[in-house]
Swiss-Prot record:
Homology family: Belongs to the membrane fusion protein (MFP) (TC 8.A.1) family.
Nucleotide-binding in keyword set: no
Species annotation: Escherichia coli (strain 55989 / EAEC)
Compartments where found: Cell inner membrane
Stored InterPro entries: CusB_D23, Multidrug-R_MdtA, RND_pump_MFP
Topology in the lipid bilayer: Peripheral membrane protein
Official protein name in the record: Multidrug resistance protein MdtA
Pfam families per the UniProt record, alphabetical: HlyD_D23 (PF16576)
Biased composition (Basic and acidic residues): 399-415
Function: The MdtABC tripartite complex confers resistance against novobiocin and deoxycholate.
Taxonomy of the source species: Bacteria, Pseudomonadati, Pseudomonadota, Gammaproteobacteria, Enterobacterales
Keywords: Cell inner membrane, Cell membrane, Membrane, Signal, Transport
Induction: The mdtABC operon is transcriptionally activated by BaeR.
Length: 415
């Protein structure tokens, strides 16, 4: 019985072990079958996918613009300073006490406007004295002329000598000379009185007063009472390289006034527009430049004396010029070039000859034609014959977003 019991346990253990072994064998076989198709598919797809990625990776995004034909003005530029057309220091021409000022600091005045008054008392007294002396001498002259007339009648009958007649004639002439001197004295006294009223010699803007009412002033004071600057019109003096002189002279010979624009310090806002007035008569040998003067009406008071401005003078207009954005123009070992897009959005490098240009646009004199598309952004990622994706500019994009998109594009171009 004991032997039979042990045999049964042995059989049970063997069956259990066999069942476990069968389970693990079946499970492993199913896993290998399910993995094989995936591995085979991946092995089949990987080469093809890799080759396809090599052939058609992400296209480099670029921005483009079309070359257009238009009239382009040619400007000569220089740095300049605004100066008053006239600057006058108003001084007193007589000595005396300042009684009144008749202007507000900073106001515009006209020539002849009353600016200040000096105590006129002494000048009125002097005028009255000279007028009295003149009246006295006129009376003396009248009496001398009557005596001369009588002497002339008596001389005809020899009742007076020739010597007495000549003496009376001399007295009349002497008195006439005295009268002329008296008249000059009266005019001088009147002038001194007039000068006690100080008027504006020119139109312009008055500055800050240099003296207060009540002070004793004299004709020898160098500071004066106030300074007037004529700002309507106002002038601009700027410099140009000596190489531009021929261009300016040629433009002047055309007979039309040359337009000069005044721009602010940042060169972003036009302040006023005037015309060329004159060229200096010599070149500065130290700087190789020549001074140029322009005049502006300045009715809006946009320009002030000693103001620093950027000057632009229009000397010519180039008609039917091919124009592209300045950002499209590049410089390489072979010279200036642009990337041109064809109908399939493939790029090719074109050597060009640039002309007039500024911060926004440039004239292309040779190398491309109007209607050609040129790349303006994304240029650093281009190679000859590469196909690109033309995208629209997003002006609202923040600098951080632009940096991120550019880095992503570079990664895409390299992948």
């Amino acid at each position: 019985m004991k032997g039979s019991y042990k045999s049964r346990w042995v059989i049970v253990i063997v069956v259990v072990i066999a069942a476990i072994a069968a389970f693990w064998f079946w499970q492993g076989r199913n896993d290998s079958r399910s993995a094989a198709p995936g591995a085979t598919k991946q092995a089949q797809q990987s080469p093809a996918g890799g080759r396809r990625g090599m052939r058609s990776g992400p296209l480099a995004p670029v921005q483009a613009a079309t070359a257009v034909e238009q009239a382009v003005p040619r400007y000569l530029t220089g740095l300049g300073t605004i100066i008053a057309a006239n600057t006058v220091t108003v001084r007193s021409r007589v000595d005396g006490q300042l009684m009144a000022l008749h202007f507000q600091e900073g106001q515009q005045v006209k020539a002849g406007d009353l600016l200040a008054e000096i105590d006129p008392s002494q000048f009125k007294v002097a005028l009255a004295q000279t007028q009295g002396q003149l009246a006295k001498d006129k009376a003396t002259l009248a009496n001398a002329r009557r005596d001369l007339a009588r002497y002339q009648q008596l001389a005809k009958t020899n009742l007076v000598s020739r010597q007495e007649l000549d003496a009376q004639q001399a007295l009349v002439s002497e008195t006439e000379g005295t009268i002329k001197a008296d008249e000059a004295s009266v005019a001088s006294a009147q002038l001194q009185l007039d000068w006690s009223r100080i008027t504006a010699p020119v139109d312009g803007r008055v500055g800050l007063k240099q003296v207060d009412v009540g002070n004793q002033i004299s004709s020898g004071d160098t500071t004066g009472i106030v300074v007037i600057t004529q700002t309507h019109p106002i002038d601009l003096v700027f410099t140009l390289p000596e190489s531009d002189i021929a261009t300016v002279v040629q433009a002047q010979k055309a007979g039309k006034p040359l337009v000069v624009e005044a721009w602010d310090r940042t060169n972003s806002k036009k302040l006023s527009e005037g015309t060329l007035l004159s060229l200096d008569n010599q070149i500065d040998a130290t700087t190789g430049t020549i001074k140029v003067k322009a005049r502006f009406n300045n009715q809006d008071d946009a320009l002030f004396p000693n103001q620093f401005v950027n000057a632009r003078m229009l000397v010519d207009t180039e008609q039917n010029a091919v124009v592209i954005p300045t950002a499209a123009l590049q410089m390489g070992n072979e010279g200036h070039f642009v990337w041109v897009l064809n109908s399939e959005n493939k790029v090719s490098k074109h050597l060009v000859t640039p002309g007039i240009q500024d911060s926004q646009k440039v004239v292309i004199r040779a190398g491309i034609s109007a209607g050609d598309r040129v790349v303006t952004d994304g240029i650093d990622r281009l190679t000859e014959g590469a196909k690109v994706e033309v995208v629209e500019a997003q002006s609202a994009t923040t600098p951080e977003e632009k940096a991120t998109s550019r880095e992503y594009a570079k990664k895409g171009a390299r992948s």
